[in-house]
Amino acid sequence: MNFRLHGAFSNPSFVKIFFTKASPERRLTCFHVTKHGYSFQTDLHDYRKIMKFVISRNELGNLIKKVQNVVPQSTPIPVLTHVLIESCNDELVFTATDLTVSTRCVVKAKVYESGSVTIPSRRFFQLIRELTEANIEVAAHSGEMATITSGSSCFRLLSMGKEDFPMLPDMQNALRFTLDSERLKDMFQRTSFAVSREESRYVLTGVLLSIANGTMTVVGTDGKRLAKIDTEISLDPSFSGDYIIPIKAVEEIIRMSSEDVQSTIFLDQTKIAVECGNTLLVTKLLSGEFPDFSPVISTHSSVQLDLHREELISLLKQVALFTNESSHSVKFSFSPGELTLTANCTKVGEGKVSMAVNYTGETLEIAFNPFFFLDILKHSRDELVQLGISDSYNPGIITDSTRSLFVIMPMRLHDD
């Protein structure tokens, strides 16, 4: 092939480009032709195409979205801000990791050249969201550049090779069992809200997954409230183990779980993985011992009340407007046939609401954080929930018919 070149060469000249057939990689070799003969040669191997595929914009956007949240926003390791893309046999594999949580997603696509590349994840996702054409072509070149083509638009993103990207942990030899994805999602949703967001309380920043006697129990707590739910699983009843899953991994499992699909859960001493449909998530476990919560949930409640959930949610939202920002305390006053909620703040005023309840004892007062109580009610599934209390100093126990249990610690009774 002959090309006439300007600019980079001092004088207009011709370049001959040859495919070197002897090379299995079909290297491109460039010879600069002068009047005195071949003055030099350049190996263009670094710019050959190493991957190419075409996929619909919607499917590519959904694919990136599934792995995007795992990518760290800031890290001293540049390749971790990238997503690894591998193409082979009309399949694409997207992988992302922050070295604690890793996720991999597989989809079908039209693959023209098998290969791999890593692309800056957030920039790539932002670009795909702005494109309007139905299909997108992605091609990677060994010169650390990826080309994204959509209709008449063409973009080039700096990329990196696969060799620097961490490998996904191997879970093939891990113990495994299956569980309905919607059930798994529901269990994590109804417990993760209670997890501590304070890094100083390390083990409480994760959700406990405990297995014993053929039952899987999921627990989240921050020390002020606790959420627990369990379900039976198809696993040898003699097996037992406790696994503390980072909240980031739990939130990703909730996102990836879909209806009418079985999830496979893999258990290892230091890792746990969940596979749902075409997505696999692997996470390291938090080290440490989860606090023993059995004394709290086994507390005997001398008073058992039925509460209408929606009505109580509405009343709590109203009276919470009158709480002190430093304490957020609402007084629950139980008298025969009635529950009265009271809050007052010197800078705002006072709120007082009431509802009918099936209480027949003497007047009983206890204070709770209304926002913690609202969280619990929002994660209950029944319209009628049961509240168990004993006095002003012991925790309240809230249950429904779905094998869930919630604990909320009382607050000090006082007037602002």
Swiss-Prot record:
Any single Gene Ontology cellular-component annotation: DNA polymerase III complex
Q: Name one GO molecular function term.
A: 3'-5' exonuclease activity
Q: Where in the cell is it found?
A: Cytoplasm
Q: Which residues cross the membrane?
A: none
Using the UniProt record, give the first listed, main subcellular location. Answer: cytoplasm
Xref: InterPro entries:
DNA_clamp_sf, DNA_polIII_beta, DNA_polIII_beta_C, DNA_polIII_beta_cen, DNA_polIII_beta_N
Please, one GO biological process term? DNA strand elongation involved in DNA replication
Entry keyword annotation includes Transferase: yes
Classification via SMART domains: POL3Bc
Assigned keywords, A-Z:
Cytoplasm, DNA replication, DNA-binding, DNA-directed DNA polymerase, Nucleotidyltransferase, Transferase
Q: What does this protein do?
A: Confers DNA tethering and processivity to DNA polymerases and other proteins. Acts as a clamp, forming a ring around DNA (a reaction catalyzed by the clamp-loading complex) which diffuses in an ATP-independent manner freely and bidirectionally along dsDNA. Initially characterized for its ability to contact the catalytic subunit of DNA polymerase III (Pol III), a complex, multichain enzyme responsible for most of the replicative synthesis in bacteria; Pol III exhibits 3'-5' exonuclease proofreading activity.
Record text on subunit structure and interactions: Forms a ring-shaped head-to-tail homodimer around DNA which binds and tethers DNA polymerases and other proteins to the DNA. The DNA replisome complex has a single clamp-loading complex (3 tau and 1 each of delta, delta', psi and chi subunits) which binds 3 Pol III cores (1 core on the leading strand and 2 on the lagging strand) each with a beta sliding clamp dimer. Additional proteins in the replisome are other copies of gamma, psi and chi, Ssb, DNA helicase and RNA primase.
> What is the similarity comment for this entry?
Belongs to the beta sliding clamp family.
The protein here is known as: Beta sliding clamp
